[in-house]
Curated annotation (Swiss-Prot):
<feature type="domain" description="ApaG">
    <location>
        <begin position="1"/>
        <end position="125"/>
    </location>
</feature>
<dbReference type="InterPro" id="IPR036767">
    <property type="entry name" value="ApaG_sf"/>
</dbReference>
<dbReference type="GO" id="GO:0070987">
    <property type="term" value="P:error-free translesion synthesis"/>
</dbReference>
<dbReference type="Pfam" id="PF04379">
    <property type="entry name" value="DUF525"/>
</dbReference>
<dbReference type="InterPro" id="IPR007474">
    <property type="entry name" value="ApaG_domain"/>
</dbReference>
<protein>
    <recommendedName>
        <fullName>Protein ApaG</fullName>
    </recommendedName>
</protein>
<dbReference type="InterPro" id="IPR023065">
    <property type="entry name" value="Uncharacterised_ApaG"/>
</dbReference>
């Protein structure tokens, strides 16, 4: 499968303090992903692969069908956005991965998701 310049992805993460418990080494993050179809043909997101790395270098792999229970079709010029979450044992870490995509001709491709940070914000006084 080849990378496709026709589809792009953006990710934004946020620390969820209310669901976290630092004393129990539980740090909860939400991340919002936007997938934009910049091409001329519809595409569908079939599956996902994530590599989650905590601040100690511990890696967790997550893969499965679709995202948040769906395999969205994205029309030309359209986008699909969803929010999900990750729990790690340290106040910082990273995520990266790819989506398994297919166009309307049945051509499969990987949409790479560049590394992004999961980090508890630092308070500045």
């Amino acid at each position: 499968m080849a990378d496709s310049p026709r589809v792009c992805v953006q990710v934004q993460s946020v620390y969820i303090e209310a669901q976290s418990s630092p004393e129990d080494e539980r740090f909860v993050f939400a991340y919002t992903v936007t997938v934009r179809n910049l091409g001329r043909t519809p595409v569908q997101l079939l599956g996902r692969y994530w590599l989650i790395t905590n601040g100690n270098g511990k890696e967790t792999e997550v893969q499965g069908e679709g995202v948040v229970g769906v395999q969205p079709h994205i029309q030309p010029g359209g986008e699909y956005q969803y929010t999900s979450g990750a729990v790690i044992e340290t106040p910082f870490g990273t995520m990266q991965g790819h989506y398994e995509m297919v166009d309307d001709q049945g051509n499969g491709f990987h949409l790479d998701i560049p590394v992004f940070r999961l980090a508890v914000p630092t308070l500045i006084h």
